[in-house]
Regions:
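C-terminus-biased signal that marks the final domain/tail of proteins
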Residues: 1-103, 193-235, 241-353
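Internal mixed beta-strand/loop scaffold within catalytic domains of large alpha/beta enzymes
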Residues: 92-187, 203, 323, 335-337
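Basic side chains
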Residues: 123, 160, 190, 272-277
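Short histidine-centered catalytic/ligand-binding loop motif
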Residues: 186-194
């Protein structure tokens, strides 16, 4: 068996990086557009043209926050043979359809809990099965900024991953049912990975005009980790005193619990948080890539489990599953990613070339 997700190495100016990306992933970018065109129409009643028009309102905040992202998106569009508006809409997809969040299970493992004294960051990405065919791995040289290694949806400029300064990020989609014109979460992803210091990474959440809701789990190779829960109007930072820091798709901070909307949609978020915490306990002091993958492959309450499988009783468009799982070792600077369900393995290592 081999890794199914293509590894695309990017370098040069932002536009040049995008051009390489779009050219290498043109078919997958087209698949991303087709997937979200269908999803927007089915769940939000939006045509793709309307989605592109809605995405335009986020262009100004993106330009102000991270202008290189705009240039990179333009390069992706040219390379993939699609419009810039198409790529902008992909990168704003969570804000266009914020009422339908991804479901993910995240854990950060600190040195005192790992087998080798390393810091690990891991998660499942629970979304719709067609997204599996859109997955790419990006190795991005962007001097003078840190070099990045991340897993993303084709056409996106941000995703879960880490940089060569030891900063890593994972994401849980959350919702209070409110959104504003601001910086979309996939752009925040990239802003976080562009930093060299944990506090600077946290500042990307705390100092930025945020468009929506979410929780970025940000960790460093120095053994620090925080869940940065946020809404458009506020944020909170959650941490741990040594045990794995775990998060799913409901707010944990008292600041936001009363306004949480996902709890009405995904009751399994409570089950998954309970299981990922409990399943990791027997491995405290022994947590490494293999044991973390075992935790992510937990099947309690299957199909609505940490390793989530499609529920055939749900309408086809509502069937969520673990598209893949990823484990990042922030010290050895290697990520392991599965082609599909973590229970099926194997996890393939990917490093900077």
């Amino acid at each position: 068996m081999t890794l199914n997700h293509p590894i695309i190495r990017l370098q040069g100016s932002p536009f040049e990086r995008g051009l390489i990306y779009g050219s290498a992933a043109a078919k997958k970018v087209a698949h991303s557009i087709e997937t979200y065109s269908t999803l927007f129409a089915g769940h939000a009643g939006l045509s793709w043209e309307k989605a592109v028009a809605l995405a335009r309102q986020f262009e100004g905040p993106i330009q102000e926050y991270l202008p290189s992202a705009i240039e990179e998106m333009k390069g992706i569009a040219q390379g993939a043979g699609v419009t810039y508006g198409d790529i902008l809409a992909l990168n704003c997809r969570s804000e266009i359809m914020f009422a339908r969040p991804d479901g993910c299970s995240v854990m950060a493992v600190l040195p005192e809990s790992s087998a080798d004294g390393h810091t690990y960051l891991a998660q499942t990405w629970d979304w719709i099965m067609p997204a599996r065919a859109s997955t790419v791995i990006l190795d991005i040289k962007q001097e003078p900024l840190p070099r990045l290694l991340m897993v993303a949806e084709a056409g996106m400029v941000g995703g879960k991953g880490f940089n060569d300064k030891g900063i890593g990020v994972a994401l849980n989609a959350l919702s209070t049912g409110k959104g504003k014109v601001g910086v979309p979460l996939h752009i925040l992803y990239r802003g976080i990975l562009n930093t060299s210091l944990l506090t600077d990474a946290m500042d990307q959440v705390t100092h930025t005009k945020r468009a929506g809701c979410g929780s970025f789990t940000i960790a460093s190779a120095e053994g620090l980790a925080f869940c940065m829960e946020y809404t458009p109007d506020n944020f909170d930072a959650l941490t741990t005193h040594g045990e794995p820091l775990c998060h799913t798709n409901h707010y944990l901070s008292p600041l936001f619990v009363a306004d949480d909307k996902v709890k009405f949609l995904l009751s399994d978020t409570y089950v998954r948080l309970n299981r990922i915490r409990r399943a990791s306990k027997p491995f405290i002091g022994k947590l490494n890539v293999d044991t973390i993958m075992k935790v992510l492959g937990d099947h309690a309450n299957c199909p609505d489990s940490v390793c989530s499988h499609e529920d055939m009783h749900d309408p086809v468009s509502m069937r969520m599953c673990s598209v893949y799982a990823v484990v990042m070792d922030l010290n050895s600077q290697c990520l392991w990613v599965t082609n599909g369900y973590p229970c099926e393995g194997p996890a393939y290592p990917v490093k900077f070339e």
